[in-house]
Regions:
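Residue-level recognition of oxygen-bearing side chains
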Residues: 35, 45, 252
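Short acidic, hydrophobic short linear motifs in intrinsically disordered regions
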Residues: 44-52
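Conserved adenosyl
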Residues: 112-248, 253
Length: 253
């Protein structure tokens, strides 16, 4: 066997990059859970100051910051030994109401490791997994990652792109959000169109329970949620039926 050294080195370089990305993915999740990104938004902090602000260990925080700076997830002021998030990093990592939520995407990826053993079994049997069989981090990550896009586009551009829909919703209509998950899209529409009624539908009971809690916390009274699948939900008098969270699962035959 003849091995080309240049191709070998190129392949190993890609593999090492993948391994580094895997480690960094875990550190993104840690930074999100501990509030490290939020603490860095809008201010420059030393490792000690960040640790004190987040009630964490300075030794671990210093290593976390080194990784994040090397990966371009935080910026470093070498002159003052301080770290901070620039505007773009803040938008993606520390703005819960912004148009991008990168930590949410990493939560989705995290689920793949939780279901690895089941995936191995499925490779052997050809079977699949129900949505509800996944780890809860998938449901939370999906809500966060998709909600960011809804914040930026759903009311301002997606609904207006549908002829007459905004006018109907403004006047008072009835709408269904099928496969609503934790209800982010349903709640946003209900807040934007208070004279309309919105029904969030999902077969996953735990997600429906979370959606109901989210709506109550947001003070939304014109949205409610029911557990049903896409073929058995009640009601046929809807002015709008939306598939948002569940669009990628739909069959278009």
């Amino acid at each position: 066997m003849t091995v080309a050294e240049d191709r070998l080195n190129a392949f190993l370089g890609r593999a090492v990059g993948d391994m580094a990305a895997s480690v960094s993915a875990v550190l993104v999740l840690i930074g999100d859970e501990l509030g490290l990104y939020s603490a860095l938004a809008g201010q420059r902090l030393s490792p000690g100051e960040l640790a004190e602000k987040t009630d964490t260990s300075e030794r671990y925080v210093r290593e976390w910051l080194a990784n994040q700076a090397a990966g371009g997830y935080v910026d470093y002021d070498a002159q003052n030994d301080q770290y901070y998030l620039n505007e773009e990093q803040t938008l993606c990592l520390a703005d819960p109401n912004g148009p991008v939520d990168l930590p949410g995407a990493y939560q989705i990826i995290r689920d793949l490791f939780h279901v690895r053993e089941r995936a191995v079994e499925n490779f052997r049997t050809g079977k699949g997994m129900e949505w509800g069989e996944h780890h809860p981090c998938l449901f939370e990550g999906t809500e966060r990652f998709f909600r960011a896009g809804y914040n930026a586009n759903l009311v301002s551009s997606w609904l207006p792109a549908l002829d007459g829909v905004v006018e109907k919703l403004t006047a008072g209509a009835r709408a269904a959000d099928v496969g609503c998950g934790h209800g982010a899209s349903t709640i946003l529409m209900a807040q934007a169109f208070p004279t309309s009624e919105f029904v969030g539908i999902d077969y996953h009971g735990a997600s429906i329970a979370t959606a109901t809690e989210r709506a109550a916390k947001a003070g939304v009274t014109n949205a409610y949620f029911e557990a049903a699948d896409a073929t058995s939900y009640e009601g046929g008098d809807y002015d709008l039926i939306a598939f948002l969270d569940a669009l990628s699962h739909c069959s278009f035959r």
